[in-house]
Design a protein with these regions (language model features):
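Active-site neighborhoods and metal-handling regions in enzymes and metal-associated proteins
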Residues: 1-462
């Protein structure tokens, strides 16, 4: 693989070697070029809507990479690329930029990458430089990053598509982009357009996400299999991390939640350092990254391998709700609609479980559902865990969109308004879903044990 794209190595079942036409494993130069052309087409449509002056203007698109961030002197955090830049280029190197330019339709690509520097490469590893970047991406016009400002000045765009309110690379923004903006061009936000493109996954992207789901499912099975009473959350965390990497993941997609007992009712608990007692359940919300695409799966199970009657009751209630929500995952339905359905189904389960009285009105049952499940039913998924935040969850789902479906019920141990047997129990069940043309969605996490019988069977496989 080119030095430009060393992040995470090149492991896993999906690809053993990157072919000559691939920029990142599974994604070719043609795919990245098509993404840039689609973005140019979206801007062309936007320009036409703004009137004849805008459609005849010189348009510039500016997308910056992330810089390296440091946790302390000389100690960097693991590098995480700006996903919009990565989506359009495939480049995993910091201190880089992409510019698209053209009259009416900005379809001419110019890349900027750091200059080769043997002194820095001794410490940080090889850079590709201009020639390597051109060979990797197929983009013919490549400059050193230090030339970005001069090139922008020479292009003289009258409409600039750029997100500068919170620049992802403050240094490049201040040195190279800000002088251009001070010249008074019309500036329009690019992020809504890139997110609308990223939301619709190509077959190649779905294949990468499917592999991320397969890897994560294997990690869940292995982690369930080593569970036992009085086990440290840190050990489960380490096992899950190890198994993801051992099965081909580059790394975890986010700090996982490994929450035993009542800690499962803290939605973003990530301390993962307490003992899960014999007879308690553990909630593990985790996922991996596989060549720039992620999984996000949650399972809840008893660490001693057997659900108690109360645990089984609550678990089955959440599972029934999740099945109902999954059945709605089809084109034309929105995440907000599925969320409304989730609340109604949870309200019904709360009545059946006796957590609220059977005589509770529908309106009060919905209030109780919001109390015991204070989060949405899901979110978009892709290169990021909470992907494409510019997209509203009220938008109708389309084939190729990837989402999560993750209902839960969380009963705090000090809640004296519910039957005692449920206090201190928290259950969430989360799957990753791709919307398809057919009625049935593609469940990327389908190999992860989910029924009580399958979970208990996985726990018994020590």
């Amino acid at each position: 693989m080119s030095p430009l794209n060393q992040e995470g190595g090149n492991r896993g079942r999906f690809h053993q070697d990157t072919s000559a036409s691939e920029v990142t494993p599974g994604l070719t130069q043609t795919e990245f070029d098509l993404r840039r052309q689609r973005l140019a087409s979206l801007i062309e449509v936007q320009a036409d809507r703004l009137g004849p002056t805008a459609s005849s203007n010189k348009h510039l698109v500016i997308v910056l990479s992330h810089p390296i961030c440091y946790m302390t002197n000389d100690i960097p955090y693991p590098f995480h690329q700006n996903q919009d830049f990565l989506y359009l280029t495939g480049i995993l190197e910091p201190d880089s930029a992409l510019v698209l330019c053209g009259t009416g339709r900005p379809d001419q690509a110019i890349l900027f990458v750091p200059r080769r520097d043997p002194a820095r490469e001794l410490w940080d590893g090889p850079r590709s430089g201009k020639d390597g970047a051109a060979a990797l991406t197929g983009v013919e016009r490549v400059h050193c990053t230090e030339e970005l400002g001069l090139v922008l000045k020479s292009l003289k765009g009258s409409t600039v598509w750029y997100d500068g309110s919170k620049p992802c690379h403050p240094g490049l923004h201040q040195t190279h982009v800000r002088p251009l903006l001070e010249g008074g061009p019309m500036v329009r936000s690019l992020r809504p357009l890139t997110h609308s493109l990223r939301a619709l996954k190509s077959p190649a992207e779905v294949a990468l996400m499917k592999e991320a789901g397969r890897i994560t499912a294997q990690a869940f099975k292995k982690t369930m299999g080593m569970s036992q009473g009085d086990i440290d959350e840190a050990l489960l965390y380490a096992k899950f991390d190890f198994e993801c990497r051992a099965h081909g993941a580059n790394f975890l997609a986010y700090p996982p939640v490994v929450a035993g007992g009542n800690r499962a009712n803290t939605l973003h608990y990530i301390n993962n350092n307490q003992i899960v007692k014999n007879g308690e359940m553990v909630l593990l919300d985790g996922g991996c990254e596989y060549f720039c695409y992620v999984s996000d799966i949650t399972r809840t199970w008893p660490v001693n391998g057997k659900f108690s009657p109360a645990q089984a009751e609550l678990y089955e209630g959440v599972l029934e709700v999740q099945k109902g929500c999954l059945s709605l995952c089809s084109p034309g339905v929105s995440l907000d609609h599925i969320y409304s359905t989730m609340l109604a189904l949870l309200g019904r389960q709360l009545r059946q479980l006796g957590i609220v009285k059977s005589s509770t009105s529908d309106a009060d049952a919905l209030k109780a559902a919001r109390r015991y499940c204070p989060h949405h039913v899901g979110h978009y998924l892709g290169m990021d865990v909470h992907d494409t935040p510019e997209l509203s969850r009220s938008q109708p789902l389309q084939p190729g969109m990837a989402i999560t479906i993750e209902p839960g019920l969380y009963i705090c141990e000090d809640d004296d308004q519910v039957p005692e047997r449920f206090r201190g129990l928290g259950v969430r069940i989360e799957d990753d879903v791709v919307i398809q043309d057919e009625i049935n969605p593609l469940i990327l996490s389908s190999d992860t044990p989910k029924t009580i019988a399958d979970v208990e069977r996985a726990c018994a496989q020590s």
